């Protein structure tokens, strides 16, 4: 379903992920590279080897100029043509929630990630208060064209389920960033209600994890 999207869907530059790439990284795999805007930004930053995976062939052709190689296909079905422990870092920018079995993909990709290598994921938080409000008080679970209840999402995660998924796949979380709803009043709510309730304001988590 993702490959039927408006072309603009594939044209985001994921600076929110790029900022967490560890120093010393040379070889990067971007899963779901779209039209290559993130690849372009990576190229401008001088990384030695940039590889993408993209299911949408038309978008992949658009992005080829920014990558050393783009593997076209379904990430859950293709076998990656790379040596063991080839990459220093793998990016999953809003990808895992679109997969049937993201747990297995994360495990499989350990083979091409070097020991101690990094993965950086962005994943929507289904525990956001707007989703819960509509579900609990209105009985509504309404899919949308984008966002947390994007129609093409097959899996839904909370912080706890994200942590368990990564741990079971063999990764250790080293960093966590939160993108929140109502950002101007988040700090006030945090002080008033306590840190445990902040998860209800989070729209998306960005997780930095290391291969054990």
Model-predicted segments: where are they?
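Short N-terminal helix/helix-N-cap motif within the alpha/beta-hydrolase-1
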Residues: 100-104, 131
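A short beta-strand submotif of the Rossmann-like class I SAM-dependent methyltransferase core
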Residues: 89-95
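Conserved N-terminal segment of class I S-adenosyl-L-methionine
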Residues: 1-85, 89, 103-106, 121, ...
